[in-house]
Amino acid sequence: MTTAATKAPERLHYTGDDESDRLLAGDPLALLIGFALDQQVPVQKAFSGPAELRRRLGHLDAGRLAAADPGQLDEAFRRRPALHRFPGAMARRVQALAAHVVERYDGDAARVWTDAADGADLERRLKALPSFGDMKVRSMLAILHHRFGVRLPGLEERLPQHPTLGDVDSPEALARYQEQKRAHKARLRAEQGAGG
């Protein structure tokens, strides 16, 4: 079996905040939580969430998050400034994600990829994560390959052919990625408007 993480980056340039960017690179659960929060908010807001949640709770431990009182976790998400546009729903998602990591990987989020047998297995493991749809899975595959050096048989053929967060290696690259994403969405809206 070929293994996964051969090199963790020093930081992932997703937030503009050095502490948050370092946490994303150094704590696999933080990275997964950032992806769980990456919905209907800017990338910077979503991926800043894990560091702020750690400040509010004093930890980012999968077992403690999974076992937390849902009301207390909800309060941590709602405290101003709220961690997300939909704090209650995201508190539940993060708790479900933590529970999944505890149940399947003994609380070690890195095992999602370090224990994967090949690209297909890694893709299955990511798809099984609560709140991870196809776009998030493809983006995670690219990040793991490009930023963490994960090399598994059959992984390269699963990598997306379009820009993803996996291509972001600097604040400038994040700005380019976000501009490309906005332009793509504008094209889709224009095509839908022309067809209707």
What function would you assign to each model-found segment?
Residues 1-21, 26, 119-128, 134-196:
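C-terminal accessory module of base-excision DNA glycosylases/AP lyases that mediates lesion recognition
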Residues 19-30, 40-42, 84-89:
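Structural motif
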Residues 32-36:
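Short, aromatic/basic-rich helix-turn unit that serves as a nucleic-acid recognition element
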Residues 38, 95, 99-102, 145-149:
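Amphipathic alpha-helical core segments of compact helical bundles
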Residues 47-53:
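Short Gly/aromatic-enriched secondary-structure transition segments
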Residues 53-128:
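Alpha-helical ds-nucleic-acid-binding substructure associated with the helix-hairpin-helix region
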